[in-house]
Structures are given as C-alpha cells and as structure tokens.
Curated annotation (Swiss-Prot):
GO terms for cellular component: cytosol. This reaction introduces a second double bond into the aromatic ring system. This is Chorismate synthase. One of its GO terms (molecular function) is chorismate synthase activity. Reduced FMN (FMNH(2)). GO terms for biological process: amino acid biosynthetic process; aromatic amino acid family biosynthetic process; chorismate biosynthetic process.
Length: 364
C-alpha cells in the first residue's frame, strides 16, 4: 500500500533514506540455484555510485553491498534475498538551511503536506540515493535473464541538453563517463558540462535502454501489459517526466503505412513498436526512452516559501549532479530488468505448456 514494492512474482521492496544509517532491499521470488555473490551486484553499483567523475555529485559513497540472506555457498536458495548498503558520507549540515524551507521543483513541499513532516537531509526517502538498491536488485535480475534466457539489457545516454548522439557505437558506452554511444561528441559534452557547472545551473537528459533476446509472449493483458509495466517502472525513477516505448511520441506524425512493422517469414522489417505489440513482447528488441528533468538543486537563487508560508529565497547548497541523467543509465537498466524478470516468471507460471504452431520470427 505504501508504494515501496514492485512486481508480482519477482518482488523488490526497498527501504532507507539518503542520510539514514543504511539502504536496503528484500528480493522475493528469485529462483533457487542461481550463482550469485556481491561482485555480481557491485559492478552495476559502481556504475551508478556518486563521486566517480567530475560530471557528477562530489558525494563519495563506496556503495558496497552486503548480502544478509537468501544466498548459501554462492547460490540463491529460493528464499528472500536481503541486501544492505551503508551510508558513509552524509553531510547533513549542508541541508540545515532548508529545514524549514521548501526547494522549488523538489518533493519537500509535497512530502510535508502528505505526511505532516519530512526528513530534509538530502531529500530523505525522495532522494535518488534510494535507487542504489534498485540497481542491486536489478543486477540479480540481469544475471538470471542473461544466464538462463540469453536476455541482455544495455542502457546509454542518448541526449544531454541540446547534444544528441548521432552515432550508436555500443562498444563506446562503457568507455566514457557519460555512457554516451557517440565518441565524436565527447569533447562537446565535456565543454558543455564545464560551462554548466561554472554557471551553477543544471540540465535535463534522455536515457535509452534496450533489451535483446526477449522471447515472444511476455505481458499480461489488459492492465498488466508489458509496456504499461515498463512505463510504470521507468516513470518511478527520480526526475523522470516522460517515457517512450519504441518510436514513442514520434508516432504522432507517422502514417500507418510508415509505422507498422511489416512481417515476412524472414522476420520483422522494422521495430517502430519497440518490441511490444498489444502489450505482449514480439521477440524483437525492447526499446524504451526516458526524459529526465534538470535537477532543481542549483546555486542560482530562486523564490519559494517557508514551512510557515512566508516568502523566502532559496540557494541550494550541498553536493548535487548537474545532470542526473548520467548516473540514471544503470538505474534504467535495473528497472527494465526487474519488469522483464517478473513477467518471465509470470509467463512461465501460466503458459509454460503452450506450444504455438506458428513459427517464431525475428528481425530481418
């Protein structure tokens, strides 16, 4: 009821706040026998963690995950997997000036009105720090999906502010601090971010995530359509203000003759639908994009109100990301993995004995 869990058969529940003692999560429904250890999760956590480059927040958290339960002798037992990450670099004093002040564009005001109080230190539960546990849980799902079913999930930053990736060289994504697939734009990105930090402002971004090897048939019409659950999961990431599946909002200007993905025995001719038809996976790559707003934690003064309703000026102090989209890449991968894992287990539970006589087709 309180919105801290996602999934039906593969259930992830997270807990913890930005400046609390620790973050944690419980994973229910992971099949037994999966070879798993902390290192499997640490790789993605290191991709997400703060302080890894000059383009992200200066907060330095090692984000070292500890397994509390559910793994014995290097394999999952089928019972609840408990994970924890300690917070070690809190500087709560940086937030003392907003104890009774609402930051525009943040959840300060809405949390106060909903709960009657709020943890103002780093945003408390509303902080993107919480997503560390989603990434850890997503890493578990990613390993199972790849090892058992050959499904791979890859995300990248497709646009930062006005700078768009014009080339998609997936071998370059992990070779730069931006997770950017177009190496010809890296110098431009560096210069743009340097100027942005000097100005004390922030900027939005577009993150893309692609899942390949997904079988036909995942998705539960009508209210648990695969694309609906993916959109729900991605929209639940902090700062996300829009989600696209496939061509997304570009379909507004497309004609039916242009948008439909023609089929032949050799496969689909295109993938405008993003790998999902009628809420069910088609066997093509699943493609999703998220639009992330620029963070409101900037040093440029802005008008707001106090908890007493009085007008006040806000100048945000502390350590913040000038573009939250950079560290969102592994988060988007994790959320897509969690949804696919959940739907794979649900499909297996109901449809494992289905044997369609229609040949399976892929991309031409």
């Amino acid at each position: 009821m309180s919105g801290n869990s996602i999934g039906q058969n593969f259930v992830v529940t997270t807990f913890g706040e930005s400046h609390g003692v620790a973050l944690g999560c419980i994973i229910d429904g992971c099949p037994p026998g999966l070879e798993l250890n902390e290192a499997d999760m640490q790789h993605d956590l290191d991709r997400r963690r703060p302080g890894t480059s000059r383009y992200t927040t200066a907060r330095r958290e090692p984000d070292e995950v500890r397994v509390l339960s559910g793994i014995f002798e290097g394999k999952t037992t089928g019972t609840s997997i408990g994970l924890m990450i300690e917070n070690t670099d809190q500087r709560s004093k940086d937030y003392s000036n907003i104890k009774d002040l609402f930051r525009p564009g943040h959840a300060d005001y809405t949390y106060q009105q909903k709960y009657g109080l709020r943890d103002y230190r780093g945003g408390g539960r509303s902080s993107a720090r919480e997503t560390a546990m989603r990434v850890a849980a997503g890493a578990v799902a990613k390993k199972y999906l790849k090892q058992v079913h050959g499904i791979e999930i890859n995300g990248f930053l497709s646009q930062l502010g006005p700078i768009k990736a014009e080339a998609l060289d997936f071998s370059q994504i992990e070779q730069n601090a931006f997770f950017f697939p177009d190496p010809s734009k890296l110098d431009e990105l560096d210069e743009y971010m340097r100027d942005l930090k000097k100005s004390g402002d922030s900027v939005g971004a577009k993150v893309s995530v692609v899942a390949t090897g997904v079988p036909v048939g995942l998705g539960e019409p009508v209210f648990d359509r695969l694309d609906a659950d993916i959109a729900h999961a991605l929209m639940g990431i902090n700062a996300v203000k829009g989600v696209e599946i496939g061509d997304g909002f570009e379909v507004v200007t497309q004609k039916g003759s242009e948008h439909r993905d023609l089929m032949s025995p050799e496969g689909f001719a295109s993938n405008h639908a993003g790998g999902i038809l009628g809420g069910i996976s088609s066997g093509q790559p699943i493609v999703a994009h998220i639009a992330m707003k620029p963070t409101s934690s900037i040093s440029i003064p802005g008008e707001s109100i106090t908890a007493q309703g009085e007008i006040a000026e806000v100048v945000t102090k502390g350590r913040h990301d000038p573009c939250v989209g950079i560290r969102a890449v592994p988060i988007a991968e994790a959320m897509l993995a969690i949804v696919l894992m959940d739907h794979l287990l649900r499909h297996r539970a109901q449809n494992m004995d289905v044997n369609s006589q229609t040949p399976t087709i892929g991309m031409r």
